[in-house]
Amino acid sequence: MAQIQFSRGVSEPVVPEVRLTRAKSGNSGTATFRFESPTILDAESTDDITGMYLVDEEGEIVTREVKGKFINGKPTSVEAILIMNSQDEWDRFMRFMERYAQENGLGFSKA
């Protein structure tokens, strides 16, 4: 099962908007995840955000580039950036996203 976590072992049920960019050479790329009102920011949540973990049967992809957005002093969203520096990292990310998309009803559209 493909899951996104902000704290190890705690799945985030909010499905993000994901934007992809890729170098013309194909050797590097960036995925930007935007979560509106994720449950990790709920007042009842006591878990710390330690990164973003993309977990599936192949293992785990990790980024520490996670930022919160605050409006009037209250957390409203989380943005995470995953940088891929090789074709292998890109391919691994795409395999994760295919699984995650199937499980969460996501589609893909080219900009």
UniProtKB/Swiss-Prot annotation:
Any single Pfam family the record assigns to this protein: Psb28
Topology class, membrane: Peripheral membrane protein
Biological classification of the source: Bacteria, Bacillati, Cyanobacteriota, Cyanophyceae, Oscillatoriophycideae
Any one GO biological process: photosynthesis
Swiss-Prot/TrEMBL keywords: Membrane, Photosynthesis, Photosystem II, Thylakoid
Keyword tRNA processing among record annotations: no
Compartments where located: Cellular thylakoid membrane
Record-linked InterPro entries: Psb28_c1_sf, PSII_Psb28_class-1
Quaternary structure note: Part of the photosystem II complex.
Keyword match DNA repair: no
Name recorded for this polypeptide: Photosystem II reaction center Psb28 protein
Chief place of localization: membrane
Domain of life: Bacteria
One cellular-component annotation, GO: photosystem II oxygen evolving complex
Family: Belongs to the Psb28 family.
SS bond list: none
